[in-house]
Amino acid sequence: MFRDFASWYHVVFAVDTTQSTATNRIKLYINGEQYTWDGNTTQPNQDQQLYWNVGGTYYPYIGRRNGGDYFDGYMAEIVHIDDQQLDATSFGEFDTNSPNIWKPKDLSDLTFGGNTSYHLDFEDSSSLGADVSGQGNNFTVNNLTSIDQTTDTCTNNFGFGFN
């Protein structure tokens, strides 16, 4: 799916299990393009409650799975918005001068509804898990220190099509 593992990618998972059509329950966008699930992809049941929206009983991990599987890469920003299924255009847009280039948007106009919404921008090296959405859903950072933060130079922070 990803041709260049060193490239910047903009990934949006849009989830709404209330959708009657199974393939509309989880949508994946990569650099502004919707990914088409193959026939072998299992979608959640209609109205299924998923783990990351069960505030207080399940705490999401970012960059880790099953205790020992860790993400080997960089993350620039993570946003979770509860109670709505937003598409990629809420978070990014195609450049008007270069229509094949997908670039991130300023997220200050987003509405962070629901109890489990958060926005991690990783800008404060002394508090990498700080939620800047105003919801107060701060993360506890493990096995990282302020020296693990890489400063974004704001160059080449765009993506091309992934197909």
Region roles according to the model:
Residues L50-M75:
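Extracellular glycan-interaction patches encoded by glycine-rich segments
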Residues I26-L28:
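Short beta-strand elements bearing conserved aromatic residues within extracellular beta-rich modules
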Residues V15-T17, N66, D124:
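Short beta-strand segments enriched in hydrophobic/aromatic residues
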